[in-house]
UniProtKB/Swiss-Prot annotation:
It comes from the Eukaryota. May act as a tumor suppressor. Keywords: Tumor suppressor. This is Leukemia-associated protein 1.
Length: 78
């Protein structure tokens, strides 16, 4: 079973919705997120440090343009 983390999505004004990239099977069926939504992300590695590196180095995969900013360090809960 892959580890699951929760990422809190912060939207910059005036955006109120953000479209998700289909990077996670856990997000299938969710096309939009509202302001302040918390969502699960399934990561490929079991190792927590590798997961953090994956999020940090590939942050563009987990957001859409300038509309969405994820506070990675403060929002990961195993």
């Amino acid at each position: 079973m892959r580890p699951c983390i929760w990422i809190h999505v912060h939207l910059k004004p005036p955006c109120r919705l953000v479209e998700l990239l289909p990077f996670s099977s856990a997000l299938q069926g969710l096309s939009h997120l509202s302001l302040g939504t918390t969502l699960p992300v399934i990561l490929p590695e079991r190792n927590e440090e590798q997961n953090l590196q994956e999020l940090s180095h590939n942050a563009d995969k987990y957001q859409m343009g300038d509309c969405c900013k994820e506070e990675i360090d403060d929002s990961i809960f195993y």
